Swiss-Prot record:
Belongs to the protein kinase superfamily. AGC Ser/Thr protein kinase family. CDD domains: PDZ_MAST2, STKc_MAST. Residues 7-22, 43-60, 874-892, 976-989, 1418-1443, 1482-1502 have a biased composition (Basic and acidic residues). ATP binds at residues 518-526, 541. SUPFAM superfamilies: MAST3 pre-PK domain-like, PDZ domain-like, Protein kinase-like (PK-like). Residues 172-185, 197-210, 233-244, 992-1009, 1685-1696 have a biased composition (Polar residues). This is Microtubule-associated serine/threonine-protein kinase 2.
Length: 1798
């Protein structure tokens, strides 16, 4: 047809090449009357144009006018003859395709269309064939184009007169079009087209009538820009398109052959297709354009007008489909075929998980494209993004897999891209925005000219920039070579091939040794395993095949594997490999040590708002990452949020996840969001009932919004402690979810407004209105996160840092053995895989594992080559640039070292970077991990290395130990330390890493370093601060002289305020997954791994100072100081050099006055009481190695005495030995212990928390004073990591949580106990913080029912709670102030929890644990270990016990024990207060016990009330009891006391309360920290008065907690006494000044003032410790009875506990409370003198005089808190008992005064 029409055209393209639209148009034109034929001029033009050639054909398709256009224009009635001519012309031009010549009149739209190479090539040709005739258009073109276009004149010739006619025709048609336009698209006001309708697309129906002037917004611009841009001649003028305005359009493009598209003749059609019409000419009324206007070829792209996005998309798609029906249909058909043939369901799953995930995504993208195409929603932008995502997935495939299956994925992606290529090109042409392109081009041109100094001409530059000069074939060849599987993926791997070989080794179950069960789930169990060759720890999830097959969920297992393998995000658990065995599908993932958030909530209740913010923000980032990849988790809940060793979050468990479509920004329009919210229509209701979204329950289809609903539930649970919807059955629960309103806590528990608002928006019933549905950005912008640095979350210090006892410590996890039993599945028959071929594809190995494994292999090879195994591989060797400070890697450990140096490097660097960000512990973690790797001794392999570390030291200044302030390096490791530990034993390593801050204390033996080996303490903070002002001088010289080993540099190291890890710590492999033993893929876990933390210990500590005793003197006096955690009342006992005799051995050795003692003989001393430290020193013989750090380097600040020191609770290190606890008890309590410890680490003070984190992660030796020091910046908590608070929290397990009121700020106390204390500390802190919005009265906030999970009987390590470790510790660590009482019953529940629990979980949690059972357990615990000590509410004790005056003796006794054993009163040992006889105390205690037992029943009913009312009292009472002198403290007390105390823990817990008003009489001026509260199990002397008994009881309860917390206390009370007696002289020598500070007991009885110590308090005090003597037990019982009092005392116990909680046995908590009564040091690290000081003056009680450099002491106010000091009130609260204050005052004598008096 066309042929006949274009009779002049020599070579018409075959009709079959034309689009239907073109053919139809041709037919129409045929049918038109002859007059419509193109005028002769037009025909001539066509003749001139010549045959179209192949290009023409190709273009034919592209340029074919849209059928719609033709239909509209083809109606003869509608179109005038001019229209006829125009049509004809267009058809003829279509045939000709005018490729050879560019008509000036060609429409730009046409030009835009062809994007093919032919188009580009045509662009290159700018030759114009002259058309014989010139029309107005031609003239116009000439004029407007100016001379910028190379051959404009030639183009003029081509212009034929017919155009004029076409103009008229156009104008007519224009008006017609307006009326008849069927185009669905809205008019485009911006259409730039001038009236040049002849060629202009202006007429296109798609645009409203071009006549409207509004359409010509560009007109003025057009007129002014007569010139085409200078680049006009460039073929690169775009994609051969013109800009809408003349200025913008390039002469080239307009004159290029591109413009001669088949539909060129019909400007109207083009106009219809183009978005912008040339604004250059405004049609006159007749529709004619003035000749001045140059006909612009218009872009076919839809106008970028203000039309709404959706309508614009629809319009463009209509145009597109009308114009290219075949292209669209073909694409849809091919897409459907592609999807059906390649669906993951239709092919065997890929063996490689990452590739399998990518496979899913490619298919999902194809589905989405098909959907959009059918819905008319496709845009070129969509194609761009689709292509980008496909390329991104391809890149991911290459990066994450070395499998041969990459080829399959590549092929898949190529197929899809080919399918969408042509439609994408066509749409690109249609939508091309010339103006936008022009501006971009102009900018590029300017940039090229100015910035790049381009020499070549701009056109060529642009062509090259556009990639038009490249040879695709050549590039393809290069790509194929690059992508070949032979190419090693790891650029940084030195032996690429070597690495690839091991990577081919498929993992199997035989490669791993199972260590223990971590947890059970519905489908299988998770085990802690260790890779046999690499020695790395992993978590192996074993899923029973039979279960999967029976449930037809094999595919789901593959989905989980794919997601875990593909995901690479610091907040998502990563998988290393997977394989199948006879019975199981196994997935080996990184091991995240800290347990899950559900267990944390269970143990401590609602979290502090700051902690919630961090956890939630990290989860939001994890979710954002997953959603961006189309992953819908579907099972978000606290159980699946794991806590890394650094305290950060990792999301896990993708067993129910679905893989949907990757996020596309083009999908953000309303319609798609709605579709996205119903992405899955499987009607499946899956997930955990409490977290299932309403749309899932209603089976309305669901999508990503379900995860945001679950996030809302999680946020509520974090803040409140329980889920918002409860039900006895899923149906009931679902009913509430769908219809019930959320109940918000009110009053004190009210949530912060922003938190409540965020929660309510996340819990919106309508998924479309739910926050997060649009994107995670919505959530991140919420005011709740104001001020949050989303990019630095990993750098933030976490408040809760798990304290691991060993590398194999899984105590933070609940095994759930009672619910699931998968262990038996091993015996099941083998699963026949005949029907499950796909299962065989399950085995895969991620690049992570390959790299690690290959690294290990290389390491081992290197090892073999190297002769000295110890240095087998040094990081320096691996990479000189590894400034991490790993000078050498221990050869032996290398095998289990992180793996390849690159991995190590990455880990370290990651930890360094991410941890740098989180300055605190992460670096420690890194170090710890590395520590295993590095041999400390090896570090200084050579002088250069040493020098390198040293060179940093100079910055440090004096102490080598100090970490370079700027650098993350914890500090150089002393050479000798390295020597001492040439190799780190795995065991030691595990221990140290496990110990975390507590580790040091816990395993003193472990941390025992050779003299020189003492870990150097480095405090980045300190460094930053005053840089050893004390250290300057010779000591500096001496220290610097020591060669320093490189230490792994970790930013976190710097973060550690005071990192005093012992080298032993360093070896702890406990490290996190990163630990050599554990592999953690992500920086977060890596960083968090505790082992890493220990590493810093290697180099961080400065070399110990070796002091050789001269005669009987060491020549220095040490003093115990109270270091409060921030503003809390929890303090930890630290020891400082109070005085150094000039010319004495200490002075000669370089010991400096005012330095903080971190280690004695390699054993951390923070948290130890004074007597224990003295004993350590005396035990060392003629020489002692003392590690010190300048106080300035710590975060400890000296401040005035605290008025409320009597409330202070000492955070104790738990001394508990693993053996004692036994695996089971440890499991049970370890979680709590950890939590408490961490909680303590969390110390309220942020700085403390950060320190703690680093410490805990770094050294986290539970008892390690060092740790506390390192934490000091954060809080002494580490040192005190002590359990007081932790204990408190532990005590309540939930108690802490349950009694937020016990906001033991110093969870530090909790830190006393390694784990529990941290939990406790956390709980108090959490409560405090939690309160913050509603925290104000944290004490009063009842723990959430969850939090309340019945607290195991306080100290009883009630097996019920595996987390009970906290509770176990509770007794020891709870400061009375904490009001552990609430913890006891967990009765403190948030007011909400007080309500009858709605949730089964609440009920479960609240299920009362019989008080008696708890007591029994607690008593056992107490007896068995200090850790487990009963916390008796002091108030109860007070009630039980008749008010008694606290005999000064008692108070003093506690302290005196500390001060020195056997020391005469004159020597500073407090004598028992005459006021009470031990017998009386015992009687009181027995009575108490009975009363407690009686009260137990009552308590169950009244517990909540009691908790709220008595909690404080009880806690105080407990404190008093706690204050009971410890044997160690009151050594002066008859040795018998000591012996008795010996029954209990050797040292009473050092809770100041437990210590009672021990006179800070330091035997030698060295104030021993308050003795551990733990007292011998045997009854102790009781203070004469019943109060004393009460106090004793409480102290016993509290003391036990303290004792527990003071796990590190090495000396039993008896031992302490003995040691004290034996070394009294030595002590005296040590602390010549009698004014040593008694660390914990602030109060000493007045008698103590007199200096007379009686044994009385000892016994009770001793009993106070974990080990409860029978009498103590009785006392504890009494304490329980007094629990009510305690509750009263302890605001922490809200009255509004849920009945359940009330029912909970508070006594156990009370004992814990008692422990809590042991006052937690406030976070501010202030030393307070012991009770003796308290005796001095009441106010002094508030703060023990902190021995300033000046030497004065602060009195420990805690005396009041000391049970002994307080009269009837065991409670520490001074205010409670008027007399108590006075007594406390008496007791509060400064140690010096006390000593003098004594």
């Amino acid at each position: 047809m066309k042929r006949s029409r274009c009779r002049d055209r020599p070579q018409p393209p075959p009709p079959d090449r034309r689009e239907d639209g073109v053919q139809r148009a041709a037919e129409l034109s045929q049918s038109l009357p002859p007059r419509r034929r193109a005028p002769p001029g037009r025909q001539r033009l066509e003749e001139r144009t010549g045959p179209a050639g192949p290009e023409g054909k190709e273009q034919d398709v592209v340029t074919g006018v849209s059928p719609l256009l033709f239909r509209k224009l083809s109606n003869p009635d509608i179109f005038s003859s001019t229209g006829k001519v125009k049509l004809q012309r267009q058809l003829s031009q279509d045939d000709c395709k005018l490729w050879r010549g560019n008509l000036a009149s060609s429409l730009s739209g046409k030009q835009l269309l062809p994007l093919s190479s032919s188009v580009h090539s045509s662009v290159g040709q700018v030759t114009w064939q002259s058309s014989g005739e010139a029309s107005n258009l031609v003239r116009m073109r000439n004029q407007s184009l100016g001379q910028s276009a190379p051959s404009l004149t030639a183009g003029l010739k081509e212009l034929s007169l017919p155009r004029r006619g076409s103009f008229c025709r156009t104008s007519n048609r224009k008006s017609l079009i307006v009326t008849s336009s069927t185009s669905p698209t809205l008019p485009r006001p911006h259409s730039p087209l001038h009236g040049h309708t002849g060629n202009s697309p202006l007429d296109s129906p798609r645009n409203f009538s071009p006549n409207a002037p509004a359409h010509f917004s560009f007109v003025p611009a057009r007129r002014t820009d007569g010139r085409r841009w200078s680049l006009a001649s460039l073929p690169s003028s775009g994609y051969g398109t013109n800009t809408p305005s003349s200025t913008v359009s390039s002469s080239c493009s307009s004159q290029e052959k591109l413009h001669q598209l088949p539909f060129q003749p019909t400007a109207d059609e083009l106009h219809f297709l183009t978005k912008h019409f040339s604004t250059e000419s405004v049609p006159d009324e007749e529709g004619r354009q003035s000749p001045a206007m140059r006909p612009r070829s218009r872009s076919l792209s839809p106008g970028r007008s203000p039309v709404s996005f959706d309508s614009e998309i629809i319009m463009m798609n209509h145009v597109y489909k009308e114009r290219f029906p075949k292209a669209t249909a073909q694409m849809e058909e091919r897409l459907a075929e592609f999807i059906s043939s390649n669906t993951p369901d239709s092919v065997l799953p890929l063996a490689d998980g990452a590739l399998s995930f990518i496979h899913h995504q490619v298919i999902e993208m194809a589905r989405d494209c098909l959907d959009k195409s059918r819905s008319g929603l496709i845009t070129s932008q969509y194609f761009y993004e689709l292509q980008d995502n496909l390329e991104k997935l391809l890149q991911d495939a290459h990066e994450r897999s070395e499998s041969s299956e990459v080829a399959f994925v590549m092929q898949l992606v190529k197929k899809l891209m080919i399918i969408i290529a042509r439609p994408a090109r066509l749409l690109e042409c249609l939508e091309f925005d010339p103006e936008e392109f022009y501006h971009l081009l102009e900018a590029a041109e300017g940039h090229a000219k100015e910035g790049q100094g381009i020499k070549c001409d701009i056109p060529r530059y642009i062509v090259s920039q556009l990639g038009l000069t490249r040879d695709p074939l050549e590039e393809m060849a290069q790509l194929s070579s690059c992508d070949s599987p032979d190419t090693p993926e790891t650029d940084d791997s030195i032996e690429g091939h070597g690495a690839s070989l091991p990577s081919k080794k498929t993992p199997s179950e035989e490669d791993f040794e199972t260590i223990k069960l971590i947890s059970n789930g519905a489908y299988g169990a998770v085990f802690l395993v260790r890779h046999k060759s690499t020695r790395q720890r992993f978590a192996m999830k074993k899923i029973n095949k039979q279960n999967l097959i029976l449930r037809n969920q094999i595919q789901q297992a593959f989905v989980e594997r794919d997601i875990l393998t593909f995901a690479e995000n610091p907040f998502v658990v990563s998988m290393f490999c997977s394989f199948d065995t006879k019975r199981h599908l196994c997935m080996v993932m990184e091991y995240v040590e800290g347990g899950d958030c559900a267990t944390l909530l269970k143990n401590i209740g609602a979290l502090p708002v700051d902690m919630v913010r961090l956890y939630f923000a990290e989860t939001v980032l994890a979710l954002e990452y997953l959603h961006n990849y189309g992953i819908v988790h579907r099972d978000l809940k606290p159980d699946n949020l794991l806590i890394t060793s650094m305290g950060h979050i990792k999301l896990t468990d993708f067993g129910l996840s679905k893989i949907g479509l990757m996020s596309l920004t083009t999908n953000l329009y309303e319609g798609h969001i709605e579709k996205d919210a119903r992405e899955f229509l499987d009607k499946q209701v899956c997930g955990t009932p409490e977290y299932i979204a309403p749309e899932v329950i209603l089976r309305q289809g669901y999508g990503k919004p379900v995860d945001w609903w679950a996030m809302g539930i999680i946020l509520y649970e974090f803040l409140v402690g329980c889920v918002p919807f409860f039900g006895d059955t899923p149906e009931e629960l679902f009913g509430q979810v769908i219809s019930d309103e959320i109940v918000w806590p009110e009053g004190d528990e009210a949530l912060p407004p922003d938190a409540q608002d965020l929660t309510s928006k996340l819990l919106h019933q309508n998924p479309l209105e739910r926050l997060g549905t649009g994107s995670a950005y919505e959530v991140k912008q919420h005011p709740f996160f104001t001020g949050l640095d989303w990019t630095g979350l990993l750098r933030q210090k976490a408040e809760f840092i798990p304290q691991l006892e060993s590398e194999d410590d899984t105590s933070y996890f609940d095994t759930r053995s009672e619910r699931y039993h998968h262990m038996d599945s091993e015996d099941e028959e083998e699963v026949s895989e005949d029907g499950c071929l796909e299962i065989r594809q399950f085995s895969s190995c991620s690049p992570r594992f390959n790299k690690v494994y290959s690294s290990m292999e290389r390491l081992s090879l290197l090892e073999e080559r190297r002769t000295p195994p110890p240095t087998k591989r040094s990081l320096s060797e691996e990479k000189e640039d590894h400034s991490d400070g790993l000078a050498g890697l221990k050869g032996r450990d290398r095998s289990w070292v992180i793996g390849s140096p690159e991995i190590l490097r990455k880990r370290l660097s990651v930890s360094e970077s991410s941890h740098t960000e989180s300055d605190s512990s992460p670096p420690m973690t890194v170090r710890r991990r590395c520590s295993g790797l590095l041999d400390a001794p090896r570090f200084p392999e050579g002088p250069e290395e040493a020098s390198s570390t040293l060179r940093r030291q100079p910055q440090e200044g004096i102490w080598v130990l100090t970490p370079p302030s700027g650098e993350g390096v914890s500090g150089p490791v002393t050479e000798h330390s390295g020597e001492q530990r040439p190799k780190l034993d795995e065991e030691a390593v595990g221990r140290s890493s496990g110990s975390s801050p507590a580790m040091e204390t816990r395993g003193r033996g472990t941390s025992q370093l050779a003299e020189g080996a003492t870990a150097k303490a480095i405090s980045d903070l300190a460094v930053r601060r005053a840089r050893h002002r004390l250290l300057s001088g010779d000591s500096t010289e001496k220290r610097t002289a020591r060669p320093v080993n490189k230490v792994i540099k970790s930013a976190s190291a710097t973060a550690l305020s005071l990192l005093i890890p012992s080298e032993h710590h360093t070896c702890s492999p406990l490290a996190s997954p990163m630990s050599p033993h554990s592999q953690s893929s992500n920086p977060s876990s890596r960083d968090s791994s505790p082992s890493r933390d220990f590493l810093p210990a290697l180099g961080s500590m400065r070399p110990p100072i070796i002091i050789h005793r001269a005669g009987k003197k060491y020549g220095f006096t040490l003093r115990a100081i109270r270091v409060y955690m921030g503003d809390s009342d929890v303090y930890t006992v630290h020891h400082m050099v109070w005085h150094v005799e000039d010319g004495g051995p200490a002075s000669e050795a370089g010991l400096r006055q005012g330095d903080l003692i971190t280690h004695v003989n390699g054993e951390p001393v923070h948290g130890l009481v004074h007597t224990e430290v003295v004993e350590l020193i005396l035990k060392s013989g003629n020489k002692v190695a003392i590690s010190t750090t300048p106080l300035e380097n710590t975060s400890i600040k000296v401040g005035p005495a605290r008025k409320g020191s009597y409330k202070a609770k000492m955070a104790r290190r738990s001394k508990r030995s693993r053996g004692k606890d036994g695996q089971e008890s440890r499991k049970r309590s370890s979680l709590f212990r950890k939590i408490t410890k961490q909680a303590s680490l969390l110390h309220t003070s942020r700085s403390l928390s950060s320190l703690n984190r680093s410490l805990s992660s770094g050294e986290s030796g539970p008892g390690s004073p060092t740790h506390s020091h390192s934490l000091s910046p954060r809080s002494p908590t580490q040192g005190y990591r002590v359990t007081p608070d932790a204990v408190h929290s532990v005590g309540g397990n939930s108690s802490q949580s349950s009694s937020p009121s016990s906001s033991v700020p110093s969870s530090p106390a909790g830190s006393g106990h390694t784990r529990p204390s941290s939990l406790h500390g956390l709980a108090p802190k959490l409560q405090r913080q939690y309160r913050s919005p509603r925290r104000k009265s944290a004490g009063s906030i009842p723990l959430s029912p969850l939090a309340h999970t019945p607290s195991p009987p306080p100290p009883t390590a009630s097996p019920q709670r595996s987390p009970s470790p906290l509770s176990g510790h509770v007794a020891q660590a709870f400061p009375t102030k904490l009001h552990l009482s609430p913890p006891l019953g967990r009765q403190l529940s948030r007011p909400k929890s007080a309500e009858p629990p709605r949730s089964p979980l609440l009920k479960r949690v609240q299920s009362a644990e019989k008080l008696a059972a708890a007591l029994a357990a607690s008593e056992k615990k107490l007896a068995t270990s200090r850790k487990h000590s009963l916390d008796l509410p002091h108030s109860e004790l007070k009630k039980e016990l008749p008010p008694r005056e606290v005999s000064p003796l008692e108070v003093v006794g506690a302290r005196s024990v500390l001060s020195g054993k056997g020391a005469l009163p004159g020597k500073g040992v407090l004598q028992p207060a005459p006021s009470r006889a031990l017998g009386t105390l015992r009687q009181d205690r027995a009575e108490r016990r009975e009363s407690l037992q009686k009260q137990e029943a009552i308590r169950e009913v009244d517990s909540s009330e009691d908790d709220t009312e008595e909690g404080p009292e009880n806690s105080q009472g407990a404190q008093e009891l706690s204050l009971a002198p410890h044997p160690e403290v009151s050594q002066s007390v008859a040795p018998k006391g000591a012996g008795e105390s010996g029954e209990e823990d050797p040292f009473p817990s050092r809770d100041p309360r437990s210590l009672g008003p021990m006179v800070p009489s330091l035997l030698t001026g060295i104030t021993l920290g308050p003795p551990r509260m733990e007292s011998p199990s045997g009854p102790h002397r009781r203070l004469g008065s019943p109060q004393a008994i009460e106090e004793a009881a409480s102290s016993s309860s509290a003391g036990p907690n303290l004792g527990q917390s003071g796990a590190t206390d090495p000396i039993p009370p008896e031992g302490c006494w003995k040691a004290q007696h034996l070394h009294t002289q030595a002590l005296t020598a040590l602390s010549p000044s009698t004014s040593g500070l008694t660390p914990t007991s602030s109060c000493s009885p007045p008698s103590s003032t007199s200096g007379k110590l009686s044994m009385w308090s000892w016994k009770s005090l001793i009993e106070g410790p974990d080990r409860a003597s029978p009498s103590r037990k009785a006392t504890m019982a009494g304490g329980l009875a007094n629990l009510q009092d305690l509750e009263n005392t302890t605001p922490a116990q809200p009255k509004n506990l849920s009945p359940r909680e009330q029912g909970k046995t508070q006594p156990p908590s009370a004992p814990r409370l008692a422990h809590p009564s042991y006052e937690d040091p406030s976070q501010g690290w202030l030393w307070e003198s012991e009770c003796a000081q308290a005796v001095k003056e009441d106010p002094a009680l508030s703060i023990t005089q902190v021995p300033d450099a000046s030497g004065d002491r602060r009195q420990d106010v805690p005396c009041r808190g000391c049970p002994l000091t307080q009269k009837s009130e065991p409670s520490l609260r001074r205010g409670q008992e008027p007399g108590g204050h006075q007594k406390h005052r008496d007791l509060a004598l400064v140690p010096d005064e006390l000593l003098k008096q004594t």
